[in-house]
C-alpha cells in the first residue's frame, strides 16, 4: 500500500467504494487523513463501515470541512451530467481528484525520480502495459503494475529509486489527475469511444493528450502517429520542448520507431536499425500488437533496457486473457477469444490478423456500428450475431457476408465450430471479437470472454494451443 501523507490531519471525502475507492480510503487513513466514505450503493457503504471507515451521505454534510473529494473513475465528472457529489464539491470550492493524483503527489514528495510509466489510448493500452511490465521485470527491475488494468494504484508498493510503476490509465482517470507527470508517457491511438462521458471526440482526444503533455522534464512522450489526433499531439509537444518518440505501423518514420508484423525498427535522422524481431511471437500476432510492441520497446529503451533483454522479453510475453487469446484447437480450427474487442476499431485489428474467419459479434452497440469494418468482410466466411446489436449488424452484413442471428454465445459457439469444421479450409478461425460492449448480456467483457472459453473447451476434441 502507498500511504497518502499529503492530506495528513485533514478531512477527505471519498465517493465510490469499489476497488480503487476502498484502496484510496485505506491509503488516506494510513497517511493520517480523516476519511468520510460514501457510495450510491448501500452494500459498498456497509463494506466500508465494516473496515472501520466513517460512512455518511455526503449530501447532508458541510463541504467546507473537506480538503478534497476523491472520486472513483466510474462516476461522471462532466458528461452526460456531473454526479451530485461533483456538483457539491464545486459549489464549495473543493478540488475533485482521483487515486492516480494521490499517487503523483506522493511520488513528488518522496521519490520524484522514481520511474513512472503511464499508458493510455483507445485500444491496446492493457496489452502495452502488461508488456512493458514484463520487459522491465525481465530486465531485473522491481516492477509494480496497476491502474486501469486491475490492481488499484494505491494498493501497489510505494515509489522509490529503482522501482518502476507501470500504470494503465483510462480517460476517466486522466480527467481526475490534474498534475499527472510520468517520466514516460504513452499515447497509443485515439478513435471514437466513451463519447457519452466526454461529449465530443475532440474533448476525449484532449483528455488523452494530457497524459503525454504532462511528462516531467527530461522524460519521454511516446505517441502513436497513425491517427490525426496523435500526429497533432506529437507536433504540439515537440514545439513545447518535450522529447517525443513517434511510433507507427503504417509508414516508415525518419525519426521514431516503426513496426510491422515481423520487425521493430528505430530511425534517427534518416539512419535506421532493427531493434527486435516479432515474427513467430503468437502473443503479439497482428498489426495492432506490432503497435503495442513498438510502444513497449520505446518505453523500455527510454528506461535503459538493452536489445538482448528486449528481444527475449518480447518472445517470452504470455499475452493477456480476452485479447486475441488463443483458447484451443479442434482439428484445424483455431478458437480466439478477443472479448476485449468492444468497438469496431479494436475488432478491425483482430479481423486483420486472420484469413478464414467465423466471426461471433454483437452485444450492446456503440456509435458507428460496424460499417468501418467493410474492408475485412472478404475475410469473414460467416457471422454469428448476438445481443442487442444483432439486427443492426445483420442489416450492415446483408448481401455481403453470410450470417445467422444466434442471439446468445451458447448458440453461436457450437454453430461456428460446426461450420468451421465442415468448411474444408486449412486453418479456419472461430473469432469472438464483438465490436460491442458486453452490458446487454454480461456484466463485463471478462465474463463474456470466460463464457466463450468455457463453451469452447466443452466442445468435443478441443485441445490447448501448443
Swiss-Prot record:
Q: Which organism is it from?
A: Rhodopseudomonas palustris (strain HaA2)
Q: Where in the cell is it found?
A: Cytoplasm
Give EC number(s), comma-separated.
6.3.2.9
Pathway the protein takes part in: Cell wall biogenesis; peptidoglycan biosynthesis
Q: What is this protein called?
A: UDP-N-acetylmuramoylalanine--D-glutamate ligase
Looking up Gene3D superfamilies in the UniProt record yields: Mur ligase, C-terminal domain, Mur-like, catalytic domain, NAD(P)-binding Rossmann-like Domain
Q: Which GO terms describe its cellular component?
A: cytoplasm
What the entry lists under InterPro entries is as follows: Folylpolyglutamate_synth_CS, Mur-like_cat_sf, Mur_ligase_C, Mur_ligase_C_dom_sf, Mur_ligase_cen, MurD
Family from the record: Belongs to the MurCDEF family.
Q: Which UniProt keywords apply?
A: ATP-binding, Cell cycle, Cell division, Cell shape, Cell wall biogenesis/degradation, Cytoplasm, Ligase, Nucleotide-binding, Peptidoglycan synthesis
Q: Which domain of life is it from?
A: Bacteria
Q: Which reaction is recorded as catalysed by this protein?
A: UDP-N-acetyl-alpha-D-muramoyl-L-alanine + D-glutamate + ATP = UDP-N-acetyl-alpha-D-muramoyl-L-alanyl-D-glutamate + ADP + phosphate + H(+)
Q: Which GO terms describe its molecular function?
A: ATP binding; tetrahydrofolylpolyglutamate synthase activity; UDP-N-acetylmuramoylalanine-D-glutamate ligase activity
Under Pfam families, the record lists: Mur_ligase_C (PF02875), Mur_ligase_M (PF08245)
**Main subcellular localisation:** cytoplasm
Q: What top-tier enzyme class does this entry carry?
A: ligase
Please give the NCBIfam families that the UniProt record associates with this protein.
murD (TIGR01087)
Q: Where along the chain is ATP bound?
A: 121-127
Q: What does this protein do?
A: Cell wall formation. Catalyzes the addition of glutamate to the nucleotide precursor UDP-N-acetylmuramoyl-L-alanine (UMA).
What are its GO biological-process terms?
Answer: cell division; cell wall organization; peptidoglycan biosynthetic process; regulation of cell shape
Query: Coiled-coil annotation: which residues?
Result: none
Amino acid at each position: 500500500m502507498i500511504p497518502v501523507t499529503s492530506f495528513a490531519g485533514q478531512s477527505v471525502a471519498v465517493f465510490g467504494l469499489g476497488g480503487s475507492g476502498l484502496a484510496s480510503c485505506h491509503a488516506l487513513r494510513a497517511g493520517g487523513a480523516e476519511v468520510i466514505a460514501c457510495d450510491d450503493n448501500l452494500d459498498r457503504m456497509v463494506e466500508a463501515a465494516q473496515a472501520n471507515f466513517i460512512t455518511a451521505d455526503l449530501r447532508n454534510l458541510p463541504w467546507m470541512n473537506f480538503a478534497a473529494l476523491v472520486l472513483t473513475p466510474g462516476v461522471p465528472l462532466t458528461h452526460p451530467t456531473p454526479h451530485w457529489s461533483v456538483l457539491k464539491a464545486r459549489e464549495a470550492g473543493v478540488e475533485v481528484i482521483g487515486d492516480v493524483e494521490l499517487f503523483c503527489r506522493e511520488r513528488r514528495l518522496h521519490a520524484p525520480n522514481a520511474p513512472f510509466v503511464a499508458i493510455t489510448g483507445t485500444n491496446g493500452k492493457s496489452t502495452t502495459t502488461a508488456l512493458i511490465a514484463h520487459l522491465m521485470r525481465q530486465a531485473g527491475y522491481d516492477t509494480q503494475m496497476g491502474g486501469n488494468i486491475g490492481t488499484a494504484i494505491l494498493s501497489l508498493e510505494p515509489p522509490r529509486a529503482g522501482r518502476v510503476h507501470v500504470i494503465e490509465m483510462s480517460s476517466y482517470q486522466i480527467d481526475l489527475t490534474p498534475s499527472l507527470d510520468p517520466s514516460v508517457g504513452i499515447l497509443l491511438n485515439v478513435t471514437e469511444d466513451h463519447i457519452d462521458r466526454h461529449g465530443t471526440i475532440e474533448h476525449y482526444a484532449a483528455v488523452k493528450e494530457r497524459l503525454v503533455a504532462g511528462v516531467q522534464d527530461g522524460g519521454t512522450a511516446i505517441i502513436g502517429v497513425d491517427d490525426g489526433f496523435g500526429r497533432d499531439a506529437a507536433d504540439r509537444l515537440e514545439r513545447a520542448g518535450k522529447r517525443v518518440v513517434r511510433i507507427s505501423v503504417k509508414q516508415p518514420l525518419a525519426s521514431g520507431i516503426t513496426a510491422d508484423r515481423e520487425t521493430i525498427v528505430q530511425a534517427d535522422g534518416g539512419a535506421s536499425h532493427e531493434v527486435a524481431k516479432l515474427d513467430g511471437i503468437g502473443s503479439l500476432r497482428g498489426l495492432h500488437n506490432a503497435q503495442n510492441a513498438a510502444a513497449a520497446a520505446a518505453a523500455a529503451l527510454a528506461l535503459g533496457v538493452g536489445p538482448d533483454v528486449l528481444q527475449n522479453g518480447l518472445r517470452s510475453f504470455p499475452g493477456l486473457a480476452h485479447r486475441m487469446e488463443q483458447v484451443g484447437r479442434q482439428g484445424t480450427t483455431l478458437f480466439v477469444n478477443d472479448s476485449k474487442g468492444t468497438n469496431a476499431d479494436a475488432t478491425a485489428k483482430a479481423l486483420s490478423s486472420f484469413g478464414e474467419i467465423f466471426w461471433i459479434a454483437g452485444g450492446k452497440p456503440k456509435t458507428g456500428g460496424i460499417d468501418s469494418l467493410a474492408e475485412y468482410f472478404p475475410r469473414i466466411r460467416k457471422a454469428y450475431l448476438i445481443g442487442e446489436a444483432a439486427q443492426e449488424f445483420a442489416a450492415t452484413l446483408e448481401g455481403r457476408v453470410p450470417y445467422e442471428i444466434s442471439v446468445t454465445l451458447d448458440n453461436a459457439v457450437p454453430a461456428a465450430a460446426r461450420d468451421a469444421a465442415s468448411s474444408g479450409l486449412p486453418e479456419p478461425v472461430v473469432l469472438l471479437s464483438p465490436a460491442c460492449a458486453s452490458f446487454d448480456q454480461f456484466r463485463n467483457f471478462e465474463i463474456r470472454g470466460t463464457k466463450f472459453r468455457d463453451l469452447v473447451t466443452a466442445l468435443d476434441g478441443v485441445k490447448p494451443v501448443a
